[in-house]
Swiss-Prot record:
Protein name: Cytokinin-beta-glucosidase 2
Signal peptide, first to last residue: none
Keywords of this entry: Cytokinin biosynthesis, Glycosidase, Hydrolase
Role noted for this protein: Hydrolyzes cytokinin glucosides thus liberating free cytokinins.
Species the sequence originates in: Panax ginseng (Korean ginseng)
MF terms (GO), sorted A to Z: beta-glucosidase activity
Broad class of enzyme this protein falls into: hydrolase
Transmembrane segments: none
GO BP of this protein: carbohydrate metabolic process; cytokinin biosynthetic process
Domain of life: Eukaryota
Record-linked InterPro entries: Glyco_hydro_41
The EC number(s) this enzyme carries: 3.2.1.-
Amino acid sequence: MAEDDLCSLFFKLKVEDVTSSDELARHMKNASNERKPLIEPGENQSMDIDEEGGSVGHGLLYLYVDCPTMMLCFYGGSLPYNWMQGALLTNLPPYQHDVTLDEVNRGLRQASGFFGYADPMRSAYFAAFSFPGRVIKLNEQMELTSTKGKCLTFDPYASTQLRFEPGELVRHGECKFAIG
């Protein structure tokens, strides 16, 4: 099946030598900075700014889905409907060694009201996006409990515009949350 082949290829695509969320953030920031001249409009070019509030910088935002959905999104150039009004993203980095995948699923399920996050495999993959100005920060917060019992808070964001430009996708891969 083509989806399985794509998933096995996708599984092999990894960011080398990244062992922590700080390293991942640095790596993605560098990659984003390298791509910036390629994706920013040049002189006399128009820039498509969403009507809902103009350009707002949120840094990197992460989408969590399963591998087949991720592949369909990438080849289709659009985000999945994983929230009642569009796509739900968060500033929770995918390499949090002190948060379990089950806890991440619980937080995503609570923030989105989306039943699909009942299965941990539904969020085993991530895509990091840099969306200049076309996401809105939701009023809720995603509260997770770390493996050490510490409360961690992350912000959920929403995008009702599901199409994305190739330059907005910064990185993608398999999540590395804590086991157990």
